[in-house]
Amino acid sequence: MAVQQNKKSPSKRGMHRSHNALNTPGTAIEPTTGEVHLRHHISPTGFYRGRKVLKTKADA
């Protein structure tokens, strides 16, 4: 089992953990419907960047 050679100071420990924070997912609002969706993904109504790109069950 690995054993550290020197104790890591609280400052260095904090620097090591500085990139471990969780980020909120990037969301966007569809301009035509006003729905919130993940960026670079189709909205639940089938719109992407203001254009209808996918037929949904509601359309049929």
Curated annotation (Swiss-Prot):
Compositionally biased spans, kind Basic residues: 9-19
Keywords: Ribonucleoprotein, Ribosomal protein
InterPro entries, sorted: Ribosomal_bL32, Ribosomal_bL32_bact, Ribosomal_zn-bd
Chain residue ranges for the region called Disordered: 1-46
Record-level Gene Ontology MF annotations: structural constituent of ribosome
Pfam families noted in UniProt: Ribosomal_L32p
GO cellular component, one term: large ribosomal subunit
GO biological process: translation
Family: Belongs to the bacterial ribosomal protein bL32 family.
Protein name in the entry: Large ribosomal subunit protein bL32
Species of the source: Leptothrix cholodnii (strain ATCC 51168 / LMG 8142 / SP-6)
